[in-house]
Amino acid sequence: MARVKRGVTAHAKHKKVYKVTKGFSGRRKNTIRAAKAAADKAGQYAFRDRKRKKRTFRALWIQRLNAAVRPFGMTYSRFIDGLSKSGITVDRKVLSDLAINEPAAFQAIAEKAKAALAA
């Protein structure tokens, strides 16, 4: 059986790892053992934070809405209650965007929600 020299495949595998760790500092970018560990950990962080990103953005939208409805004399929870009572089914992402970019439209929605609470 012929001897198999693995230099080419090993080099290709190492290149793949180094491509992931490009921009890392210290040994983590250019020593294969440390680079593999760093690349694995980076993948774990990426997986975890793709899930966390959804929570973080929802929290941001809620904070923005809470700040936007305070001038209308409501809290966030009362605003959401008013929206559901008035039958407005707009999600928090769109409401947050409206509050920032279309204040007049958001004001109309907030007043409808407030009217639904009073009724």
UniProtKB/Swiss-Prot annotation:
Gene3D superfamilies linked to this entry: 6.10.160.10, Ribosomal protein L20
Protein name: Large ribosomal subunit protein bL20
PANTHER family in alphabetical order: 39S RIBOSOMAL PROTEIN L20
Molecular function terms from GO: rRNA binding; structural constituent of ribosome
GO cellular component: ribonucleoprotein complex; ribosome
rRNA-binding listed as a keyword: yes
Any one GO biological process: translation
Family matches, as InterPro entries: Ribosomal_bL20, RIBOSOMAL_L20_CS, Ribosomal_protein_bL20_C
Family affiliation: Belongs to the bacterial ribosomal protein bL20 family.
Keywords on record: Ribonucleoprotein, Ribosomal protein, RNA-binding, rRNA-binding
Record's keyword annotation contains RNA-binding: yes
Pfam family, one: Ribosomal_L20
Gene (name only): rplT
Function: Binds directly to 23S ribosomal RNA and is necessary for the in vitro assembly process of the 50S ribosomal subunit. It is not involved in the protein synthesizing functions of that subunit.
